[in-house]
């Protein structure tokens, strides 16, 4: 067997193995219950959310609604490459809340209530967790919430 043929076979094997590894990783889609409390306490959220907008997940009690601005959805993704599921979920969760805060301030809202997980338009309500979808390349958190102005404590 010639040296060129050996190199060609080795290259073909390596290329095929790489495609197999990448396609296997990309096909991964694990649903992870991600703790809202953990997410809210993380530096990713703590450093970016300024407190002007309050977030109420599931059916958590909130002050009286004075004005409604509508229901909005955000679907935030972040790289999962060489990052733990927990870290990529934290980042995606933080990105979703940052988007909600930005939208609320644009609308004049001071709260987002009834926040639910909304991945693939599947509405799942929880006071304690959101769904994080971790894949081989990307991790995503999709949230749906009602933007309102609330009064009082």
Q: Each PLM stretch: what is its role?
A:
Residues 63-66, 105-106, 135-138:
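Extracellular/periplasmic catalytic domains that process cell-envelope and extracellular macromolecules
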Residues 71-124:
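Short, well-ordered alpha-helical segments
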Residues 1-5:
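N-terminal secretory signal peptides that target proteins for export/translocation
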Residues 20-27:
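Sec/Tat signal peptide C-region and signal peptidase I cleavage site
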Residues 39-81:
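Compositionally biased P/S/T/G-rich terminal and signal peptide-adjacent segments
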Residues 79, 91, 114-153:
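Surface-exposed short loop/turn segments
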Residues 28-33, 42, 153:
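Glycan-processing catalytic domains of CAZymes
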Residues 8-20:
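Bacterial N-terminal signal peptides
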């Amino acid at each position: 067997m010639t040296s060129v043929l050996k190199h060609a076979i080795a290259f073909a094997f390596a290329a095929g193995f790489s495609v197999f590894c990448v396609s296997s990783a990309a096909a991964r889609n694990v649903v992870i219950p991600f703790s809202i409390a953990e997410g809210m306490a993380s530096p990713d959220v703590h450093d970016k959310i300024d407190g002007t907008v309050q977030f109420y997940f599931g059916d958590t009690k909130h002050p009286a609604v004075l004005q409604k601005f509508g229901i909005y959805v955000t679907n935030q993704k972040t790289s999962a490459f060489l990052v733990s599921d927990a870290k990529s979920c934290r980042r995606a969760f933080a990105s979703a809340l940052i988007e909600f805060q930005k939208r609320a301030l644009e609308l004049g809202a001071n709260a987002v209530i009834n926040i639910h997980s909304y991945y693939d338009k599947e509405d799942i309500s929880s006071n304690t967790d959101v769904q994080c979808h971790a894949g081989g390349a990307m991790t995503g958190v999709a949230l749906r919430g009602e933007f309102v102005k609330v009064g009082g404590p």
